[in-house]
Amino acid sequence: MGVIELCNTSSICIGRANPSCCSIERNQRRRIICMASSVPVQEESQQKQRVTGDAFIRPHLLKLSPYQPILPFEVLSTRLGRKPEDIVKLDANENPYGPPPEVIEALGAMKFPYIYPDPESRTLRAALAEDSGLESEYILAGCGADELIDLIMRCVLDPGDMIVDCPPTFTMYEFDAAVNGAHVIKVPRNPDFSLDVERIAEVVEHEKPKCIFLTSPNNPDGSIIDDETLLKILDLPILVILDEAYVEFSGMESKMKWVKKHENLIVLRTFSKRAGLAGLRVGYGAFPKSIIEFLWRAKQPYNVSVAAEVAACAALKNPAYLENVKVALVQERERLFNLLKEVPFLDPYPSYSNFILCKVTSGMDAKKLKEDLATMGVMIRHYNSKELKGYVRVSVGKPEHTEALMKCLKHFY
């Protein structure tokens, strides 16, 4: 005899019984008394299908291609058989000078690394307000600008919504859109890498996308968006996310303050390039008050680590160092550009950033060039996308890095 007990709670306690004829007996607790059937029951293990872990994964993620990151020093060192200090790393736009000395001192003097960080990053946001001239209530910090890109999408996009992407550009926008179940409408850039504003306007009118991601200076070509172009796009009924990861090298003023007058503008910044803190992952953004309220609700509470906040605040205390490093990189960018123009199989593009995009010409294979340089200990970036087929990107390093690159390139002509 099997018994199914209905507990007097919101949950149901169920005991399994064979198919049966049932009667209900009333007592202090409701009981269903079941007479077991004499019909044989098929083994449960035979009825169940084998369940694998991927059955629990959201369907759209099953087809997601992983993001292709740059290999770290440790992996490169093993693969190339070289010490990290013997590798000329010009493939990830990192700041070769590193952070101000105050950063290392501050990290070594951290008193409470065992305590959770301030969920509002108050000290950092106050320092950023002083640095940018924008009040701290408009600023939100993150574990790198990448986290903020994902946070924006999680707050703005429903599955099936659309974003506008303007390739070639930073591929994280397309990747995060796919992770969040959104569709990407691509509006390719013009041959000179400028934005096709007319086509963007047409797409916004007919497809009704939620947001557009723009990078200025753009990665990977180093072009900038002028104020007139940006204002035209801001006039459209779409949320504009302006990524200014490289703005310090452009000579242009940041648009962070614009969020006070444009309700559809978000501006993202980072400490990775300017302050040499790529390994500590700390970025920030400027948001209209009507938007930032909801990002505060949705963000992870302890997203900026104690170490990241300490390092970023220490870096901001030495603006002279940051300025000197910026000037050094801009000067080296111009020198590198002129030297690359002398290479018969490279056609470099003018850049407002800390990298230079080059078209590989004269029958030279771009991927093989990248691989051959790697065997010599020099790393540059090669792309597989159709927009950048036949291109390589070279980060600006120190003068000695430029010399090492040029010495290796001369092996090919």
Curated annotation (Swiss-Prot):
Tissue specificity: Expressed in flowers, leaves, stems and roots.
Pathway: Amino-acid biosynthesis; L-histidine biosynthesis; L-histidine from 5-phospho-alpha-D-ribose 1-diphosphate: step 7/9
Keywords assigned: Amino-acid biosynthesis, Aminotransferase, Chloroplast, Histidine biosynthesis, Plastid, Pyridoxal phosphate, Transferase, Transit peptide
Record-linked InterPro entries: Aminotransferase_I/II_large, HisP_aminotrans, PyrdxlP-dep_Trfase, PyrdxlP-dep_Trfase_major, PyrdxlP-dep_Trfase_small
Subcellular location: Plastid, Chloroplast
Quaternary context: Homodimer.
Family membership: Belongs to the class-II pyridoxal-phosphate-dependent aminotransferase family. Histidinol-phosphate aminotransferase subfamily.
The name this protein goes by in its record: Histidinol-phosphate aminotransferase, chloroplastic
Organism listed in the record: Nicotiana plumbaginifolia
Lineage: Eukaryota, Viridiplantae, Streptophyta, Embryophyta, Tracheophyta
GN (gene name): HPA
